[in-house]
Amino acid sequence: MIDKDKIREGMKLILEAIGEDANREGLIETPDRIARMYEEIFSGIGMNAKEHLSKTFEVHSNDLVLEKDITFYSMCEHHLVPFYGKVHIAYIPNGRVVGLSKLARCVEVYSKKPQLQERLTTEIADSIMEYLDAQGVMVVVEGEHMCMTMRGVRKPGAKTVTTTYRGKFLEDESLKNDVFRMISM
């Protein structure tokens, strides 16, 4: 899906456009390195989390499941610079759960493409609701955006927090508060 030849050509043009010699020793292989890196960091393009969330296990409990501090890296679609941080996923099963590593895979699918943090948050929640048939989902994403750190307002350490709620989390404020308390532990 990734056209590495076009990326190489484009990267060489960018280097030349900023006044660099694209053929000098330190840069001559940069277009190829960027093409390989883009293949990896944009591997979520065209994917959805169904393959990771389709194998479930029966449980006889509908108690809350929280997977917190899932690290992620993504690329801001506005500036194509990284944003990164942590995702916290809480869900209430409907008689079935998924292996915990699959929640991290779900995060990877949606973070490995040009992305907005707000959309990342909702895509994760919507996929868990749909593929796990959960009674409720809450997703909290904490991200630091390099577009705010290294350019523009230049505010290193500023974090953006996005949340979304589905199902029972929309109805029960104490449930949300429980998750926020557990995240801060």
Swiss-Prot record:
Domain of life: Bacteria
Molecular-function annotations in GO: GTP binding; GTP cyclohydrolase I activity; zinc ion binding
Entry annotated with the keyword Hydrolase: yes
GO biological process: one-carbon metabolic process; tetrahydrobiopterin biosynthetic process; tetrahydrofolate biosynthetic process
Gene Ontology CC: cytoplasm
Catalytic activity, EC: 3.5.4.16
InterPro entries in the cross-refs: GTP-CH-I_C/QueF, GTP-CH-I_N, GTP_CycHdrlase_I, GTP_CycHdrlase_I_CS, GTP_CycHdrlase_I_dom
EC top class named in words: hydrolase
Subunit (UniProt): Toroid-shaped homodecamer, composed of two pentamers of five dimers.
PANTHER family xrefs: GTP CYCLOHYDROLASE 1, GTP CYCLOHYDROLASE I
Protein name: GTP cyclohydrolase 1
Originating organism: Clostridium perfringens (strain SM101 / Type A)
